[in-house]
């Protein structure tokens, strides 16, 4: 009591304390970063290695495997996957959440160094690594276009000047430049001319390499001067290479231009990028795992004018895609929802108390509690994101509850004629323990969330802490500022003030009287109510089992990502045409604002597209509806598929898949994997629960298989190394020399001119110079035949792997899809040598599914322990927790009604309901126990009186919580997919709970009281407990 009096009788100190809390909150708010969601990115590092011309199988066995064995020893690696394609290998390392990305990078570099001696000697460069997840959608895409400069020149500007500068910006993890390659001098050989001159491809390669060297020449020096020696030992352009003498034939010089076409071109001609309908170079910017997306984007935008000034005016630098506008719009929507919730909650207080003065008190208490929370958020390193702001929105109903309970009880004493300061002190003393019980038991709900590990735990931690801090500050405010304001501001109601809103007052009195009559009947028919309570428990179990489930609500971020998968034998020219066709279909859609895409590189039959949709206010369809509409149009394109998916703020795993969810097949028997993967993929493609089923296993690429006759080769004086070198020189885009420039290094690339490689007859024109100097055609010692070969070889860990990706059709949930896949695998009878498991987001969903029930039980157990400690009773906590089944039924039924799957957001709603609905029971039980102790009432009389006396605050707190959550249900615009499931769950649970717990709680109270008396050896002490 002295604690309350300290603040009630010292108003200046109390006001200044509240002002201090508010000012700290304002400062914290101004310094908080902005993000779509809490920081939940796994630390991911990508290792890249190249060996131009090497087959996928060669890359897997000679490059990927040695690196994997070394990288697999690094501590904290949770998943390691690799993909080897023509001439390149990429290994993705995903680390545990608590692994520092910089420390992991040092370990990765050490592992690469340790494996260096096991790698092929012909690799043009050492393996490199990047601290970025290639499967993440870029946070920003810049494009370079020009009517004057070539694609190679644009790529040079992008990779030499722009990308390094952008990479240095805080938060940027990787800048991937696509759409072309660096400038190069290309030597296109004429096989017939070479044969006529008696010049081998190795002769050409050696001559070019020897003619373009960069070696130190030293200096001349005398007693007084020093002269640096400089020679014309380097060739820079195609014009300088053209007259190069490579051979003498019968005394005549054979120049490079006589046997080849030499051009200034690009290093790899099999690359193409586009923005809308125009060729473009793309700079795809990804952030570091720990970076804030908004801060990173703002930093990049601030540097754009400087970047534009470093490139010629004829080059147009544009932002093709930016993830930040929809994030900002989503957060603005949440902020508006928060403001509406505060206004509605204050309106509820005004309607019940019918006093402007009384309404001012919670109108002050609520902002102080919410604003003060920002200071704690800043100190904890949190951000302003959808979840933390939703926590504050929901907290509106909670923080006003404490003020309402105190205010309503003080107002009741004032109506009885007590003086304001005395009423404030007496009223606060009576409900102080109640408010403490309500707040502590509510915070206890979130303790299991704070201890939860993995991605769900990291995702929900900010929500739980933010809400807990708001409740803690609210508890302090309701026991200090609220009673002080009541004591100094409230007065006895005047008659004319009592008439104000008399219609609502009469309705409330009528409701209370009706409730009293119905409660008397219920207390005389307790068995029926008990049966209803048991029925709700059973209904909870059935609804939870049957309701569709997913990991996280499908977001509409305004950005789509598409993966193109074409026939495995398609040429680059045909693939570029497919890219243009797909881009035209998408560009013509009325909901699309911008589209960029690229194809080429080591995977000729694949490509990527990034689509920016118009803002939500300018389109009527959701991202998923747009995908459904485009899917029908895209299906008409023969020879290729474009798989679209909406970019999400949460994406788990490092696989660059063509769909949102993955199912991975593993086997130590590669033949078994290649046999069963097509069967499983075809079966899954028939399931109605899955859409866009595709696989990264591509085993049917066209291959020309050459078979050497080793006996003939030995007789003719030819070895296998010379024959393989011939093929690499002719068809491998072999980099044979380096051109050094001040800003970069460029390559001289040699191959047979594409005009002479249009069909299989190109092999017949190839020849080798043997050890006697004779030209021996390839057909003399080799035969060839067409065959199939893999376009890529994939590993997970050290096992062969194949990943099947899929999206969800409209109306289907991830639980539907996972159950269907499990059934399909059982029906197919897949052998034990082939193991299947979900990967990425689908894997996290499976893990979360297994822990959801345990989490809910843990929350209930924690609340029980806290209540048991507060009440010093085993029984009364059970009475209070009996309110939960009805809330669960209401929440699950509401989700079913709105066709919303049970997700992580809905789980948060269930956890909140555990804390919310027990408040009603706490108020009833507290007053009933008080009446039994001091009023000498029977248990039935005590609980009946408690229900009637607490009817008004119960209605107020419930409606405050309901109206605080209602804007979440009704909100639209950006980010509503996250807000609505939370609002639906809470509103549904509150409505059902309010209808039932007003009757079930008194019945359960009496039941346990009788049970306690029956088993108690000291009934009298039990009554006065």
Swiss-Prot record:
One Pfam family hit: ACR_tran
InterPro entries tied to this protein: AcrB_DN_DC_subdom (IPR027463), Acrflvin-R (IPR001036), Multidrug-R_MdtC (IPR023931)
Localization (cell): Cell inner membrane
GO terms of molecular function: xenobiotic transmembrane transporter activity
Transmembrane segments: 3-23, 333-353, 360-380, 387-407, 431-451, 463-483, 528-548, 853-873, 875-895, 897-917, 953-973, 984-1004
Keywords, comma-separated and alphabetical: Cell inner membrane, Cell membrane, Membrane, Transmembrane, Transmembrane helix, Transport
Domain of life: Bacteria
CC terms in the record's Gene Ontology section: plasma membrane
Topological relation to the membrane, as annotated: Multi-pass membrane protein
Signals that turn on the gene: The mdtABC operon is transcriptionally activated by BaeR.
Stated role: The MdtABC tripartite complex confers resistance against novobiocin and deoxycholate.
Subunit structure: Part of a tripartite efflux system composed of MdtA, MdtB and MdtC. MdtC forms a heteromultimer with MdtB.
Family, per entry: Belongs to the resistance-nodulation-cell division (RND) (TC 2.A.6) family. MdtC subfamily.
Protein name listed in UniProt: Multidrug resistance protein MdtC
UniProt source species: Escherichia coli O6:K15:H31 (strain 536 / UPEC)
């Amino acid at each position: 009591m002295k604690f309350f009096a300290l603040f009630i009788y010292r108003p200046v100190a109390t006001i200044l304390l509240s002002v201090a809390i508010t000012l700290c909150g304002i400062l914290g708010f101004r310094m908080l970063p902005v993000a779509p969601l809490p920081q939940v990115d796994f630390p991911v590092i990508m290792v890249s290695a190249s060996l131009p011309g090497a087959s996928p199988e060669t890359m897997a066995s000679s490059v990927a495997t040695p690196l994997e064995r070394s990288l697999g020893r690094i501590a904290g690696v949770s998943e390691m996957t690799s993909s080897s394609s023509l001439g390149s290998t990429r290994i993705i390392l995903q680390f545990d959440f608590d692994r520092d990305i910089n420390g992991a990078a040092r370990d990765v570099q050490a592992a690469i160094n340790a494996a260096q001696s096991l790698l092929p000697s012909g690799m043009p460069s050492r393996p490199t690594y990047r601290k970025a997840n290639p499967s993440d959608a870029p946070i920003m895409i810049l494009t370079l276009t020009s009517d004057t400069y070539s694609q190679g020149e644009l790529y040079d500007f992008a990779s030499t000047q722009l990308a390094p500068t952008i990479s240095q910006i805080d938060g940027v993890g990787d800048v991937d430049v696509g759409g072309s390659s660096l400038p190069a001098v290309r030597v296109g050989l004429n096989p017939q001319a070479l044969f006529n001159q008696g010049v081998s491809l190795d002769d050409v390669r050696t001559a070019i390499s020897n003619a373009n060297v960069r070696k130190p020449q030293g200096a001349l020096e005398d007693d007084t001067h020093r002269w640096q020696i400089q020679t014309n030992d380097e060739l820079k352009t195609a014009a300088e290479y053209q007259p190069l003498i490579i051979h003498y034939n019968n005394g005549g010089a054979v120049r490079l231009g006589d046997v080849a076409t030499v051009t200034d071109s690009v290093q790899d001609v099999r690359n193409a990028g586009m923005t809308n309908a125009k060729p473009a170079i793309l700079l795809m910017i990804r952030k570091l795992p720990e970076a804030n997306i908004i801060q990173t984007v703002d930093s990049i935008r601030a540097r754009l004018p400087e970047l534009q000034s470093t490139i010629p005016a004829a080059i147009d630098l544009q932002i093709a895609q930016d993830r930040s506008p929809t994030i900002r719009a989503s957060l603005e929507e949440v902020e508006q929802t928060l403001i509406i919730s505060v206004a509605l909650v204050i309106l509820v207080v005004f309607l019940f108390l019918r006093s402007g003065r009384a309404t001012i008190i919670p109108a002050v208490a609520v902002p102080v509690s919410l604003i003060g929370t920002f200071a704690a958020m800043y100190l904890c390193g949190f951000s302003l994101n959808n979840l933390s702001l939703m926590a504050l929105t929901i907290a509106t109903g909670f923080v006003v509850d404490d003020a309402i309970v105190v205010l309503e009880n003080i107002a009741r004493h004032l109506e009885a004629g007590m003086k304001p300061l005395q009423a404030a002190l007496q009223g606060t003393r009576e409900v102080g323990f109640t408010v403490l019980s309500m707040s502590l038991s509510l915070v206890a709900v979130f303790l299991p969330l704070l201890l939860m590990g993995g991605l769900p735990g990291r995702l929900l931690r900010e929500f739980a802490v933010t809400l807990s801090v708001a409740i803690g500050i609210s508890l302090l405010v309701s026991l200090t500022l609220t009673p002080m304001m009541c004591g100094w501001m409230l007065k006895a109601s005047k008659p004319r003030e009592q008439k104000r809103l008399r219609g609502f007052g009469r309705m409330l009195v009528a409701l209370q009287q009706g409730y009293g009559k119905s409660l008397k009947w219920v207390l005389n028919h307790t068995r029926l109510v008990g049966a209803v309570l048991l029925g709700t428990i059973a209904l909870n179990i059935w609804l939870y089992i049957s309701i569709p489930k997913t990991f996280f609500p499908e977001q509409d971020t305004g950005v789509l990502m598409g993966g193109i998968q074409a026939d495995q034998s398609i040429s680059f020219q045909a693939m570029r045409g497919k890219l243009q066709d797909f881009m035209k279909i998408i560009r013509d859609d009325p909901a699309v604002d911008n589209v960029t895409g690229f194809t080429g590189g080591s995977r000729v039959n694949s490509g990527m597209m990034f689509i920016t949709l118009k803002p939500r206010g300018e389109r009527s369809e959701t991202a998923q509806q747009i995908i459904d509409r485009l899917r029908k149009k895209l299906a008409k394109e023969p020879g290729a598929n474009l798989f679209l998916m909406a970019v999400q703020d949460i994406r788990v795993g490092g696989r660059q898949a063509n769909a949102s969810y993955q199912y991975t097949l593993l086997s130590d028997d590669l033949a078994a994997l290649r046999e069963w993967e097509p069967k499983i993929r075809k079966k899954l493609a028939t399931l109605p629960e899955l859409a866009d089923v595709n696989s990264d296993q591509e085993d049917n690429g066209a291959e020309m298989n050459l078979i050497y006759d080793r006996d003939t080769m030995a007789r003719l004086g030819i070895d296998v190394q010379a024959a393989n070198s011939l093929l690499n020189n002719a068809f491998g885009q072999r980099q044979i020399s380096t051109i050094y420039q001040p800003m970069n290094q460029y390559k001289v690339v040699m191959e047979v001119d594409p005009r002479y490689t249009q069909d299989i007859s190109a092999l017949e024109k190839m020849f080798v110079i043997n050890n006697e100097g004779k030209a021996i055609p390839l057909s003399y010692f080799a035969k060839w035949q067409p065959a199939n070969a893999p376009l890529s070889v994939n590993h997970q860990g050290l096992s062969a792997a194949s990943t099947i990706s899929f999206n969800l059709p409209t109306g289907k949930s991830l639980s539907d899809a996972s159950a269907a896949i499990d059934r399909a695998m059982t029906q197919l009878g897949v052998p034990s040598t082939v193991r299947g498991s979900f990967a990425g987001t689908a894997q996290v969903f499976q893990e979360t599914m297994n822990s959801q029930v345990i989490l809910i039980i843990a929350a209930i157990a924690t609340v029980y322990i806290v209540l048991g400690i507060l009440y010093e009773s085993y029984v009364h906590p059970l009475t209070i927790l009996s309110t939960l089944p009805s809330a669960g039924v209401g929440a699950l039924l509401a989700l079913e009604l709105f066709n919303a799957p049970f997700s992580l957001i809905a789980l948060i709603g269930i956890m909140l309901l555990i804390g919310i609905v027990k408040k009603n029971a706490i108020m009833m039980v507290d007053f009933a126990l008080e009446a039994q102790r001091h009023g000498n009432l029977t248990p039935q009389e005590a609980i009946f009186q408690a229900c009637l006396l607490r009817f008004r605050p119960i209605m107020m707190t419930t409606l405050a919580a309901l109206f605080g959550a209602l804007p979440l249900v009704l909100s639209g615009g950006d980010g509503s997919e996250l807000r609505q499931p939370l609002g639906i769950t809470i509103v549904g649970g509150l409505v059902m709970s309010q209808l039932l717990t007003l009757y079930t709680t008194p019945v359960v109270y009496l039941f346990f009281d009788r049970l306690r008396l029956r088993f108690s050896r000291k009934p009298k002490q039990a009554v006065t407990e």
